[in-house]
C-alpha cells in the first residue's frame, strides 16, 4: 500500500506523462457528452477520437490508440455491436479499455451488454454507487443517471466486482473509492457542482482511459483520475460557483492544473 | 382566468416544485441540442435522462420518469419508431409528454410523424410560429429551423391545435403565447439573443416537460416555461451580451433564478 | 492574383454578405461538433440546419439552402448514403457544397467514401495537412483527428487535388493555404489554442460553406474562412487564454468581428 506522499507523486507522474505523450483515447461514448469528453481530454493534454463504425474502430485501434473508452449512456444495438468488436480488438492488441456502465440496472439493453462486457477484461470500471452495485449483481435504486446510493454503500460490491473481473473499479461520489479488490484508496477531492453539469461523470471515464494509457497500474490510473478531476472541480468552483460557468472553468482548470496543485490539494482518506 | 398576481404565484410555485422534487425528464431529442438541454434541466433543478433504444425508453418510463419530451429536430425512421413506443407507454402510465415539432412543414419525415403524434394526447406542444401553423395545417414559410412568421400570426392556429389535440400550445417568439384553446396567456419575457444560441428553443420544450411534471395544468406549465426561460434570458443578456458567453450565463441564470426575480420581471400582456 | 488590399476587401465583403443575407447552411456533420458548429454559424450571422434523414436532406436543399457541408467525422454507412443523396441533389440545384474529410487515410469507411465524394464536384475541400495529403493519394501519418504534417508539406498535394476535383482546397494549420490549383493564397491568422478545442477545424468547414453561399468564387470563400476564423481565434485568445473560456470567446469574437478587425489583423504571406 502506497503512502499518501507516494500516491501524490504517482498522480503527478501520470499527469506529466499524459501531457508529454498525448495519448490517443478512442471514446465510444454517448452523444450527450461527446463535446465535453473531447474538450476535457484536449484540456488535460490527451488526444480524443470518436467514431461510430465498427470497422473504423478497429482501424483506429491499430493506428496508435493508447486506450479505449466504452460508455453505454445512449447505447443502441448497433453501437453495442461496434463496442464488442472494438473491445475484442483492444484486448488482442493489449490496449487498455475502460467500461463506464451508465445507468445499468433498470435499463435492459445496456444491462445485458454490460454483463457481457465486464467479462472481457476491462482494465477499469468507472461508475457511481448505483451502477457499480447493479453491475456487481446487487439491486440498487437509480433515478435516471443519478445515483441514490452513496459510494461507501458500494464499496463491498466494488471489491467483489474488481476481484471477479480483474479490473480496477472506480466508484465516484462524494468520496471516490479506487480498488483492485485487495487494496482500496479513498479520495475526497471534488465538489457537488460537478453533478450539476452533464457529462462530468462520463468524462471521468474518459480521463481514466487517458490515465490507463500512461499509468503503471489500472489501480493507480483510477486514483489519478479521481484526484485530478476532483481537484479541477474544486479549482473551478472557486472561480465559478454557477453551473454554466463552472463547466467552462473545469476545462480551464484541467488545462492549468500543476503538480503543485496536486501536492497542495490531494486528499487521501485512511480506511 | 388568473390575474397577473395569481400567474406569478403559480410560476414561482412551479419553480419551487421543480427544485424540491427534481423530476426526471426523459428527453428523446435531437443530437445538436442534447448537451444544452441536459445542462439546462440540471441548472433549473430537474434530472435529465437521454437514450436511443425503444425498449430502454419503456424501462425508463417505468422507473420514475416525471415527464417525456419528444423533439423531432434530427429524427430518423428508427428514432421515430422509438418515439412512438415511448409515447404509447407514457400515455399508458399517465406520464405527461411534450411534442416539439422542430421544422415541421417543409421536411417530410418529421411532418408525417408529427401529424401522427399530435393525435396521441400530448400535454404540451411547443413550437415557433411557423411550426405551430404547419402542425395546425396552415401553410407557412420556414427558413430551416427559424420561423419567418410572428407568434401573433400563429395564435389562431395555436388555439385550433389546442382544441383539436387537447394539449396546451406554447408558441414562442418575441411574445410567447400559451393557450389551451379557450384561455390565452401572452408573456413578454426573453431577449433576441436567445435565437443566436442553438438549442434554446428546444430547451424550452424540455423545460416545459419539467414544468408539466409538477404543474397543476398543462396550460400553467406552458406559461411557467415561457416566463422562467424568458427571465433567465434577460438576466443572461445583462451579464453577457455576446452569444458564446450568453449561453453560459443562461445556465447560470436558471440556476440562480429566485422567486423575487420572477415577481420583479414577469411581464404578462392583456389580450 | 489579388493584392492584399483587394483580398482584405473581399473578406470583409463576404462577412458583410453573410450577415446581410443569413445563408442557410445544411450541415451533415459529426455528432461531436454539432453544437459548436451550429453556434458558430449563428454567431457569424448564418442559419444552421442539421438533420439525419436522406429524404429530409433533399427537402431542405429544395427549401432555400445556401450551401451544404459534408463532414465525415463520425460517419456510418447510413449517414454516408444520406450524404451521397444530398450531394447529388445539391449538384442538381447548383448549391455549393463543402467536403471535410476528417481523419481520412487510416479509417476505411470514410476513406472509401471521401474517394467517391471528391469526384462529385465539391466547391471547397477543407482539411488539415494529413487529410489533404491522404485525399490526394499521398500517404501521411495521422494521429487520430490530429495532423502530424505541416500545411506547407501538403501544399503540393492540395494543388493537385484542386486541379483534379475543380474544388478550392483549404489546408488549415499554422499557416492556412487556399488554392484552386493555379493560385495559392497563404494566410497566417489564428492561434494554437484553436487546436485545444474540439470542433474548431470542423467549424471552419461549416464557415467555408457559409462563405461559399455568398462569395464570388470558391477560392475567395476559402481565403475568407481562413482569415475570419483565424482573426476570431486571435481575438479570443487575447480575452481568454485557457481552452474552456477560449471556446466561449471564439463565438463572442465571431459575433463581434468588424471589418476594421479584418483590415487591422489579416496577414497574407507572399509566396
From Swiss-Prot, chains A, B, C:
This protein's pathway: Cofactor biosynthesis; thiamine diphosphate biosynthesis; 4-methyl-5-(2-phosphoethyl)-thiazole from 5-(2-hydroxyethyl)-4-methylthiazole: step 1/1
InterPro entries: Hyethyz_kinase, Ribokinase-like
Alphabetically ordered keywords of this record: ATP-binding, Kinase, Magnesium, Metal-binding, Nucleotide-binding, Thiamine biosynthesis, Transferase
Top-rank lineage group of the source organism: Bacteria
Example GO molecular function: hydroxyethylthiazole kinase activity
Cofactor field: Mg(2+)
Function: Catalyzes the phosphorylation of the hydroxyl group of 4-methyl-5-beta-hydroxyethylthiazole (THZ).
Annotated source species: Akkermansia muciniphila (strain ATCC BAA-835 / DSM 22959 / JCM 33894 / BCRC 81048 / CCUG 64013 / CIP 107961 / Muc)
Any Pfam family the entry gives: HK
Keyword Transmembrane helix: no
Residues reported to bind substrate: 50, 199
Enzyme Commission number, as recorded: 2.7.1.50
Binding site for ATP: 126, 172
Catalytic activity annotation: 5-(2-hydroxyethyl)-4-methylthiazole + ATP = 4-methyl-5-(2-phosphooxyethyl)-thiazole + ADP + H(+)
Protein name per its UniProtKB record: Hydroxyethylthiazole kinase
HAMAP family reported for this sequence: Thz_kinase
Amino acid at each position: 500500500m502506497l503512502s499518501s506522499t507516494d500516491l501524490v507523486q504517482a498522480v503527478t507522474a501520470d499527469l506529466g506523462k499524459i501531457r508529454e505523450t498525448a495519448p490517443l483515447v478512442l471514446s465510444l461514448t454517448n452523444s450527450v457528452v461527446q463535446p465535453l469528453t473531447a474538450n476535457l481530454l484536449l484540456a488535460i493534454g490527451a488526444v480524443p477520437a470518436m467514431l461510430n463504425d465498427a470497422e473504423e474502430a478497429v482501424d483506429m485501434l491499430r493506428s496508435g490508440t493508447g486506450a479505449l473508452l466504452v460508455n453505454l449512456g445512449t447505447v443502441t444495438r448497433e453501437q453495442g455491436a461496434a463496442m464488442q468488436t472494438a473491445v475484442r480488438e483492444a484486448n488482442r492488441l493489449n490496449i487498455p479499455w475502460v467500461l463506464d456502465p451508465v445507468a445499468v440496472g433498470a435499463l435492459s439493453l445496456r444491462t445485458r451488454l454490460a454483463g457481457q462486457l465486464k467479462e472481457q477484461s476491462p482494465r477499469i470500471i468507472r461508475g457511481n454507487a448505483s451502477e457499480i452495485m447493479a453491475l456487481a449483481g446487487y439491486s440498487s435504486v437509480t433515478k435516471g443517471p443519478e445515483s441514490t446510493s452513496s459510494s461507501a454503500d458500494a464499496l463491498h460490491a466494488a471489491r467483489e466486482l474488481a476481484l471477479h473481473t480483474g479490473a480496477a473499479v472506480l466508484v465516484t461520489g462524494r468520496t471516490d473509492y479506487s480498488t483492485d479488490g485487495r487494496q482500496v484508496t479513498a479520495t475526497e477531492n471534488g465538489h457537488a457542482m460537478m453533478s450539476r453539469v452533464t457529462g462530468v461523470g462520463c468524462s471521468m471515464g474518459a480521463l481514466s482511459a487517458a490515465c490507463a494509457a500512461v499509468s503503471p497500474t489500472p489501480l493507480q490510473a483510477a486514483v489519478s483520475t479521481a484526484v485530478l478531476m476532483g481537484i479541477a472541480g474544486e479549482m473551478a468552483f472557486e472561480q465559478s460557483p454557477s453551473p454554466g460557468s463552472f463547466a467552462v472553468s473545469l476545462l480551464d482548470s484541467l488545462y492549468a492544473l500543476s503538480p503543485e496543485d496536486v501536492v497542495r490539494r490531494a486528499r487521501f482518506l485512511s480506511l
